[in-house]
Amino acid sequence: MKTLNKITLDVTISIIDFLYRGRHFPRFWVLEEIARAPYFAFISVLHLRESLGLRGQVHTDLMKEHFAQTLNETEHLEEMEKRGGNKYWIDRFFARHLVLLYYWINVAYYLFDPIDAYDLSEKIEWHAADTYSKYLEEFPQDEKISAIMQDEIHHAQELSEAIRLIT
């Protein structure tokens, strides 16, 4: 599945790179819109498992962590909105349809293979950090983007820790 994760990510990145070449904030907005979906999906599945009596401290810890990650990604999304990232309806249309698909894929993926679901999300967080890093090479004075990049690195590390917790 890790190979499928890499292929999926590479294809998605290629499409987004093509559509958003030279448009930093719309690209960031789309990435942040998408970034929340796995955390919502993970929380949904963890809540379902908990409702079925399949809970434990690890479930509770993961739910808290994923909720915090969702809030943090929402703050990033709001920052990109302030910068005009969601200005055009076509960007909103694309992102919201992609996120709907991505959410349900993550629900199924996390339900049946949480380790690989976390692996895919970790790869996406590292990609987001890399995307922000490239922007910062051009605009090193942008402290807000620098802080967001650090958050993405932290999220990737948290996902790696989540994999460790459930194995």
What residue ranges belong to the model's regions?
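Non-heme di-metal
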Residues: 1-167
